């Protein structure tokens, strides 16, 4: 299979030329490739955020994709770049620091190699920019038809560094989860609470209690809605995001500006106390 589509993620930002130079290296190796930007605005050095941004990429991109990703605070050290084939047939290239964790949860690794061959690197390799000279260059060589086995020695997929992912769980009277991501563009809060765990509570218009421990155990009483327009402008709601997880938002406004939670904060969702006459904020 010819992998002539490259999906590219990094933490270098879009304010200067860094991501364009990486693309220049890739086009120099694979001029027929198409390069799609996932994002270059991962928070600097934030491997977990980068991993979360990659989580849905395997589902959304076709099998002939090379997923090229780097958030590489260890650049120039013994942390190696790896190249992986997943069950879907896609190829992934990135540092072995956990960045590929959630993408590989979506489509597990079936073959993995350390990228050690100088033939698939941009020479001379800059120790402070493995992302360009090793990750991007290797991804381009794979897109140009280089065999995966040619990049370096095969390793057991069990050697791929994986980030821990806290699962939501049932607790007395409700479901306990945590904030995993902030939708920066709109200020919505995404949790790790999946549909199957909370489905019995999710009746359209049903009001649920949401306890946010980091905000002095603030409790919100929020309606569950299928979409934002079911509440008035500026009003809070619960909804299922496009990834099938429970999320909190404000219609046409910014949830975290009003309730400033961050990833890792605990959230407990439970059925509304019957006959409660309290407003949206209970505590």
Curated annotation (Swiss-Prot):
Is tRNA processing included in the keywords of this UniProt record? no
Q: Which reaction does it catalyse?
A: chloride + S-adenosyl-L-methionine = 5'-chloro-5'-deoxyadenosine + L-methionine
- Top enzyme class, one word, equals transferase
Q: Does the keyword Transferase apply?
A: yes
PANTHER family (alphabetical): CHLORINASE MJ1651
The record describes the protein's role as: Involved in the biosynthesis of the proteosome inhibitor salinosporamide A (SalA). Catalyzes the halogenation of S-adenosyl-L-methionine (SAM) with chloride to generate 5'-chloro-5'-deoxyadenosine (5'-CIDA) and L-methionine. It can also use bromide and iodide, producing halogenated 5'-deoxyadenosine (5'-XDA) and L-methionine, however no halogenase activity is detected in the presence of fluoride.
Family classification: Belongs to the SAM hydrolase / SAM-dependent halogenase family.
Name under which the protein is recorded: Adenosyl-chloride synthase
